[in-house]
Amino acid sequence: MDTWMYLSQGFAVALTPENLVIALIGCFVGTVVGLLPGLGPINGVAILLPLAFALKLPPESALILLATVYIGCEYGGRISSILLNVPGDAAAIMTALDGYPMAQQGKAGVALSISAVSSFVGSMLAIGGIILFAPALARWSLAFGPAEYFALMVFAIACLGSMMSQNPLKSFMAALIGLGLATVGVDANTGVYRFTFDSVHLSDGVQFIVVVIGLFSVSEILLMLEHTSGGGKLVRTTGRMLFNFKELVHCTGTMLRSSTIGFFVGILPGAGATIASAITYMTEKRLAGLNAKFGEGDIRGVAAPEAANNASACGSFIPMLTLGVPGSGTTAVMMGALTLYNITPGPTMFTEQPDVVWGLIAALLLANVMLLVMNIPMVGLFTRMLSIPLWFLVPAIASVSAVGVYAVHSTTFDLLLMVGLGVFGYLLRKMHFPMSPLILGFVLGEMLEQNLRRALSISNGDTAILWSSGISQTLLVLAIAVITLPPLVRLLRRRKADPLIPDARPEQGA
């Protein structure tokens, strides 16, 4: 009963005219920042943090502003993924796998509308989980140490091969290239320079924005220039801007499953929406069976990652609010905002600052309604981007990409590296290598190495720690199963389809 009393108190905070306006501004700014390639939620929140403090907003209003920008970015990231095949952030990579093919088939409006509803469902279910189970779930998340996170990363990387069932070998090779890129830079433990080729610009490693813009945006520009004429249109959209009832029913189970998985992944500090969207996409692809068209424009391939990454984003508030541990990079920035107001994140917030905590939770509920109402009517406007002539669209994408990359270090080296990676990505795509496993390998590689180092540091180099807990053992067994079972299943199917299997052939010559 206390929970509902506190929630009503939170709505009293969130429904003040000032906080409603702040939430609306945060939703709009977050959507715009999210659709711009390379910025992402962490940059959006970081940009507005000093502004919130400079405006002397009260702590609950400042947190509402930053949280709504965060959620808005998760909504916005899908737009450029679906329309241009350029993910707004890492969490939107999986959305492009089926969203962009749908756009190319003239179904951009359907993809955008179902992704908005999936984002809404994922967020609302996750917020419900925060309201009902936050303290218990926070205690569960503490069971994950470095060894368990290492096993989780191994499982996620093992799953990458299933992203292209037609050629899992190329998926694994792409993931290995991504893992290799993640090792570039100075080793944090030993100070050794790795694969920098005596270039000081590579000492900090290859930045994520440079990789994602190069491999997706620049390579896409090269493909546009190759396959279309200068004045033509990319695709012709259909008149239907919204999904129909049959498509909604088709995606309902996907949304619910993906929201649940995304929520639990989001609770794990540092796991993030990228892992959640990858795991749910591959889970749904396996559940869909051989007749599904994942990677070719399956609507479930859009619904799954969008429900998961929004559920994960909301779930990441649980460790921040209950343990004082950031659930993601963005919530780490938000924790910095709380310290500016002399508020210590953790379990005492629920008793000492109930207006801040429950005002934030209520604002998240309102923000998701705002974002759904804001995004659905704008589907038609977004799809108009597909009718923009290439003589304008290509320079626009190139300019936005270059500005986003240059903003990281303000060096021309990053621009040259972006172009080089773009040409490399173009060649890989011509050879039918998938880009998403490469990017995910790059993102997961750093986390894999960090958690491996931490685990071995705790055990003084004893590798047994990596499989000492039940969680680690379960995840590693699942990783082995993911790698070994698909080839075995294919072999059994071939043997069943071929009546002349080796041990059943009639003897020759008597």
Where are these regions (language model features)?
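Membrane-interface alpha-helices at helix entry/exit sites of multi-pass transporters
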Residues: 59-64, 101-118, 289-302, 329-332, ...
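A structural-propensity feature for long, helix-poor, extended segments
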Residues: 70-81, 88, 298-323, 327, ...
